[in-house]
A protein has these predicted regions:
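Boundary/entry segment of secreted carbohydrate-active catalytic domains
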Residues: 13-17
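Alpha/beta enzyme core
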Residues: 1-11, 21-48, 55-71, 79-172
Length: 172
């Protein structure tokens, strides 16, 4: 996924990420990514990944991605349970967003470091700094105190070992 993102930036475009709750959605997303000749990220929510069926979905998405005509990453998105992250990687996730943003900066850093030690260097590790209230499906008004503090970014990335960073800049 790192190479996928770097190539997109160099080409002047983004790599879209779509949350896939089922295989049919993933098929449609990958088909359109192939039609556009663009890389894509298939996200799986922790709630979906937390069941045997969800882990099977991750495995199926990995196979779909391996046979796609464009680069496809499979990411466990916004996971705060280290053991779930490990199970998702074992099932085939190629990237994880280790979300320790509910804790202090130090707790978040320690959580991301723990996840890195559990999943190894081959899995792309994204972390979150700052938070938006609500969830992916329902957002609430945020305060500035919950947004990413730009003064913390460099230290957090260096100390945590995250390769990618999800920042909270507000809702549009």
């Amino acid at each position: 996924m790192n190479q996928m993102v770097a190539q997109a930036i160099a080409a002047g475009h983004a790599v879209p990420a779509f949350t896939c709750y089922d295989f049919t959605t993933a098929l449609a997303v990958v088909a359109e990514a192939e039609a556009q000749d663009r890389a894509v990220i298939l996200n799986v929510a922790p709630k979906a990944a937390g069941s045997t069926a969800g882990l099977r979905l991750i495995s199926a998405l990995r196979t779909l991605g391996e046979h796609a005509a464009v680069p496809v990453a499979i990411q466990l998105d916004h996971a705060s349970d280290a053991q779930l992250i490990v199970r998702a990687v074992q099932a085939g996730a190629t990237a994880v967003l280790a979300d320790g943003s509910a804790g202090t900066l130090e707790e978040n850093t320690a959580f991301v470091q723990q996840v890195r030690s559990l999943i190894g260097p081959e899995v792309v590790l994204e972390a979150e700094l700052g938070a938006l209230p609500g969830n992916e499906d329902k957002a609430f008004e945020q305060s500035a105190s919950q947004l990413t503090d730009s003064a913390q970014v460099a230290r957090f990335v260096q100390d945590s070992g995250a390769q990618l960073l999800a920042v909270a800049i507000g809702n549009v």
